[in-house]
C-alpha cells in the first residue's frame, strides 16, 4: 500500500510531494481567497486577474501586428525614395516638382502639377539627395494658381453682398463704404433683421435716392412731397441719405419708381357702363367690418387701390381726383375689374425706415437650394455684417487698388461655404449654369476649364454649387486653370504691379 501511494505522488510536480490536480486546486483556492478579501465575493463568476492578463496579451499582440505591418509597408513604399509618383515634393525644403518623362521640373503650385500630369495626386515626399540624382528642367506651371484643393459644394448655396457705411462718412462719398462678400449662411443674431413688409432702407447712389425693401431698390424723388408724405418720409431723409456702393447697387434688382402713378387718359370719360366718374376718379366703398376699400376708375373698369396709393393720388390732385367718391358695395360689385397699373412697388402701410446710424450694414442676400426653381432674394440690415462675433477674425481683407466700390474690400467664408461653383444668372428664376470657378480661402476666384480632363486632374468631380455672378465678380480674378495654361515653361515670373505692404508686428 505504501509503495502504491508513493507511486501516485511520483507522477506530480517537483519532488513528487503533490499531484497536478492538487496544484490547480490550490491555485483556485488562492484566487478565491484573494477575491473574498478584495471583493467580498466567492462565487468566482468573474476573475479580474485573468481579464488583466488577457488585456496585456491582446495589447502586446496588436502592437506586434502594427509593427510588422509598418515594416512590410516600408518595403512596399519606402519613405524618402523616388517611385513612380508623378508629383514629388522635397521632404526638407517643401519644393514641388513634376515628373515629365525622365526629367523633374520645378512646379509653381499643386494646381499646375496636377494639370500637367492629369492626375489628382498629392505630392510624394522625397529626400533631397534622391531629387539631386534626377535631371532637371525649367520652372513650369500657371503663376498664381492655387496650391490646395478641398472641394466643398453644399446643396444649399448662400451669397451676400454687404455695404457697411462709416458713420463719419460724408453724404454721397464712397470713401467710408466697405464692401464685403459673404459665402455661406449669414448670422442673424445681434439685432440683425431681414427687411419685410414696410421695413426699408434709404440710400443714395450717384445723384439718385433709392428705397430698398423686399429684395429690390426703387428710385424716389426727394422733392415729390405727394409721394413722400404717404410713405412716411421727409425730404431731409431722402436728400441726406448715406451712400451705396456700386457693388450693392448692381446686386439689388431695380423695381418700379416710387412716384405718382400715371393714369392713362386721366380726366377722359370711362367707357364701361355705370362708371361713377371720369378716368382717374378715386372711389371709396364703406365696409360693414374692416377698413374702407379704395378703387380707381380706368377706361374699361376699376382697379383696387391700396390706401397708401389712394392717398398719393389724392395728394397729387390729378384730373378727376379732387375728392374720393363714395360708392355703395352693391354698385361696385357690378363694375368690371381690371389690373392695368403696376403698384407692386408701393407698401401697404407707411415705411418703417431703418436708422442707418444704428444699422450701418445693408446686405443683399441670395439663397438657393439644389432642386429649387427659384432663388430667394432678401435684404438684411444690422449694426455689423452678418458674421458671428467669434468669426470676425476670419474675415479676409483683400489687396486691391480700386476705391470705386466695384470690387470687394473683404470676404468671409462661413462653415457651410461653397468653393467650387457654377455661375448662374442674376434673375432669381434663372435656370442657367455657366462657367466654373474655384474660390480660394484667400478670396480669389479662378476659372476652371469645363472639361472632364481638367476637372478630373484637379479632383473637382463633384457637382458645383450655384453662385450669382453679381457677387462672384466682386472677388479678384486669377488665371484660368487649364492644361494648356499649365504646360508652359518660365525663366522668371512677372512682378505684381499693385502689391500691398505686409505689416509685421514688432
UniProtKB/Swiss-Prot annotation:
The gene is eccB5. Pfam families: T7SS_ESX1_EccB. One of its GO terms (cellular component) is plasma membrane. This is ESX-5 secretion system ATPase EccB5. The keyword ATP-binding applies. The chain crosses the membrane at residues 56-76. Disulfide bonds join 162-363. Keywords: ATP-binding, Cell inner membrane, Cell membrane, Disulfide bond, Hydrolase, Membrane, Nucleotide-binding, Transmembrane, Transmembrane helix, Transport. Residues 1-55 are cytoplasmic. Part of the ESX-5 / type VII secretion system (T7SS), which is composed of cytosolic and membrane components. The ESX-5 membrane complex is composed of EccB5, EccC5, EccD5 and EccE5. It is a single-pass membrane protein. An ATPase (shown for residues 80-506). Part of the ESX-5 specialized secretion system, which is responsible for the secretion of EsxN and a number of PE_PGRS and PPE proteins, including PPE41. Part of the eccB5-eccC5 operon, which is essential for in vitro growth. Residues 77-506 are periplasmic. It is found in: Cell inner membrane. Its EC number is 3.6.-.-. Belongs to the EccB family. One of its GO terms (molecular function) is ATP binding. It comes from Mycobacterium tuberculosis (strain ATCC 25618 / H37Rv). It comes from the Bacteria.
Amino acid at each position: 500500500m505504501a509503495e502504491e501511494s508513493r507511486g501516485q505522488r511520483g507522477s506530480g510536480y517537483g519532488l513528487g510531494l503533490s499531484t497536478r490536480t492538487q496544484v490547480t486546486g490550490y491555485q483556485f483556492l488562492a484566487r478565491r481567497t484573494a477575491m473574498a478579501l478584495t471583493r467580498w465575493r466567492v462565487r468566482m463568476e468573474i476573475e479580474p486577474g485573468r481579464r488583466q492578463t488577457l488585456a496585456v496579451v491582446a495589447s502586446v499582440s496588436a502592437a506586434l501586428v502594427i509593427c510588422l505591418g509598418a515594416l512590410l509597408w516600408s518595403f512596399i513604399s519606402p519613405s524618402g525614395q523616388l517611385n513612380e509618383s508623378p508629383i514629388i515634393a522635397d521632404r526638407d525644403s517643401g519644393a514641388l516638382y513634376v515628373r515629365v518623362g525622365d526629367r523633374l521640373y520645378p512646379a509653381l503650385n499643386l494646381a499646375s502639377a496636377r494639370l500637367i500630369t492629369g492626375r489628382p495626386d498629392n505630392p510624394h515626399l522625397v529626400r533631397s539627395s534622391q531629387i539631386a540624382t534626377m535631371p532637371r528642367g525649367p520652372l513650369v506651371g500657371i503663376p498664381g494658381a492655387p496650391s490646395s484643393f478641398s472641394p466643398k459644394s453644399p446643396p444649399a448655396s448662400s451669397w451676400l453682398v454687404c455695404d457697411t457705411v462709416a458713420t463719419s462718412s460724408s453724404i454721397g462719398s464712397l470713401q467710408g463704404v466697405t464692401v464685403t462678400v459673404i459665402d455661406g449662411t449669414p448670422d442673424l443674431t445681434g439685432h440683425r433683421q431681414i427687411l419685410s413688409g414696410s421695413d426699408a432702407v434709404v440710400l443714395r447712389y450717384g445723384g439718385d435716392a433709392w428705397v430698398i425693401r423686399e429684395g429690390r431698390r426703387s428710385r424716389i424723388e426727394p422733392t415729390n412731397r405727394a409721394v413722400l408724405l404717404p410713405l412716411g418720409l421727409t425730404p431731409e431723409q431722402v436728400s441726406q441719405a448715406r451712400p451705396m456702393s456700386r457693388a450693392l447697387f448692381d446686386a439689388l434688382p431695380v423695381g418700379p419708381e416710387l412716384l405718382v402713378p400715371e393714369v392713362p387718359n386721366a380726366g377722359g370719360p370711362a367707357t364701361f357702363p355705370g362708371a361713377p366718374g371720369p378716368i382717374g376718379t378715386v372711389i371709396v366703398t364703406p365696409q360693414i367690418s374692416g377698413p374702407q376699400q379704395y378703387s380707381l376708375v380706368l377706361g374699361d373698369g376699376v382697379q383696387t387701390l391700396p390706401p397708401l396709393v389712394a392717398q398719393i393720388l389724392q395728394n397729387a390732385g390729378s384730373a378727376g381726383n379732387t375728392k374720393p367718391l363714395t360708392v355703395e358695395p352693391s354698385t361696385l360689385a357690378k363694375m368690371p375689374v381690371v389690373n392695368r397699373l403696376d403698384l407692386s412697388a408701393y407698401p401697404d402701410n407707411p415705411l418703417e425706415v431703418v436708422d442707418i446710424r444704428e444699422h450701418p450694414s445693408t446686405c443683399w442676400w441670395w439663397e438657393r437650394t439644389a432642386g429649387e426653381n427659384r432663388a430667394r432674394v432678401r435684404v438684411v440690415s444690422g449694426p455689423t455684417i452678418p458674421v458671428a462675433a467669434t468669426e470676425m477674425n476670419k474675415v479676409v481683407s483683400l489687396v486691391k487698388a480700386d476705391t470705386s466700390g466695384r470690387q470687394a474690400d473683404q470676404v468671409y467664408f462661413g462653415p457651410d461655404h461653397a468653393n467650387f461653383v457654377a455661375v448662374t444668372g442674376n434673375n432669381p428664376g434663372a435656370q442657367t449654369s455657366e462657367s466654373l470657378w474655384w474660390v480660394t480661402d484667400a478670396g480669389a476666384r479662378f476659372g476652371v476649364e469645363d472639361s472632364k480632363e481638367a476637372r478630373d486632374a484637379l479632383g473637382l468631380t463633384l457637382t458645383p454649387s450655384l453662385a450669382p455672378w453679381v457677387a462672384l465678380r466682386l472677388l479678384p480674378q486669377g488665371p484660368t486653370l487649364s492644361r494648356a495654361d499649365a504646360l508652359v515653361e518660365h525663366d522668371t515670373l512677372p512682378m505684381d504691379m499693385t502689391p500691398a505692404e505686409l505689416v509685421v508686428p514688432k
